[in-house]
């Protein structure tokens, strides 16, 4: 752990010398963990498990029914490259295939985002009590709002993100227990068999809109 920390410090120091300004970093190839999404009123909008492949640009998320008190539990499979997503109901074995209206999401830094700041989340001076992070911001016209993403300085793992819209809606995303792998990679990004042959519906949504 100490060696990893020293390596991160060394890499950060070297990059600070070479680069005159921060460029958006790239996330790890694969990540898996838990995602907590909180809406404007403070109640959890969704809590569940996510798997993300940044190279194939595919995301799977499924609500944890034990943590969220609602009747409709979200399960989605998003193909950002293809611009589609599947709204999945595994309980009733039903599936809707819809258009993804925007490819922006918060599991990686948006292209051309502005670097805001760099510092420690927690404490820099107490061992194992802080994480060095970078914060990025970008206005996204198709979302009518501003997306802010905070990542680790070394590794570019998303820690938390926010969407502030012009209509004063707020979504806060917190990423917990993140691992550098995908759970069941041969299955998690494959639509279930009852999605086969489902027609593409005219109705669409965005990554952020799915959590409203």
From Swiss-Prot:
Lipid metabolism in keyword set: no
Protein localization: Secreted
Highest rank taxon of the organism: Eukaryota
Signal peptide (from-to): 1-20
InterPro entries: Ependymin, Ependymin_CS
Sites carrying sugar chains: 69, 92, 112
Disulfide feature: none
Keywords: Calcium, Disulfide bond, Glycoprotein, Secreted, Signal
GO BP terms: cell-matrix adhesion
Entry GO MF terms: calcium ion binding
PTM: Binds calcium through the terminal sialic acids.
Tissues where this protein is expressed: EPDs are synthesized in the meninx and secreted in the cerebrospinal fluid.
A GO cellular component entry from the record: lysosome
Subunit comment: Forms disulfide-linked dimers.
Record's function text: May play a role in neural plasticity. May be involved during axon regeneration.
Family from the record: Belongs to the ependymin family.
Protein's UniProt name: Ependymin
Species this chain originates from: Clupea harengus (Atlantic herring)
Organism classification: Eukaryota, Metazoa, Chordata, Craniata, Vertebrata
């Amino acid at each position: 752990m100490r060696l990893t920390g020293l390596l991160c410090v060394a890499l950060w120091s070297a990059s600070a010398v070479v680069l005159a300004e921060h460029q958006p970093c790239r996330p790890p190839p694969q990540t898996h963990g838990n995602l907590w999404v909180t809406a404007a009123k403070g109640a959890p909008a969704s809590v569940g498990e996510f798997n993300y492949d940044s190279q194939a640009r595919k995301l799977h998320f499924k609500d944890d029914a034990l943590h969220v008190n609602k009747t409709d539990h979200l399960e989605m499979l998003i193909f950002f490259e293809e611009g589609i997503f599947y709204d999945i109901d595994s309980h009733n074995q039903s599936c809707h295939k819809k258009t993804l209206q925007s490819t922006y999401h918060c599991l990686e830094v948006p292209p051309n985002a502005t670097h805001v700041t760099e510092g420690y989340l927690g404490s820099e001076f107490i061992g194992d009590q802080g994480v060095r992070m970078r914060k990025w911001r970008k206005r996204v016209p198709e979302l009518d709002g501003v997306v802010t993403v905070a990542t680790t300085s070394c590794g570019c793992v998303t820690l938390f993100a926010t969407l502030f819209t012009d209509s004063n809606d707020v979504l806060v995303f917190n990423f917990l227990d993140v691992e550098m792998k995908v759970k069941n990679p041969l299955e998690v990004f494959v639509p279930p068999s009852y999605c086969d042959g489902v027609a593409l519906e005219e109705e669409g949504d965005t990554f952020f809109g799915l959590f409203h």
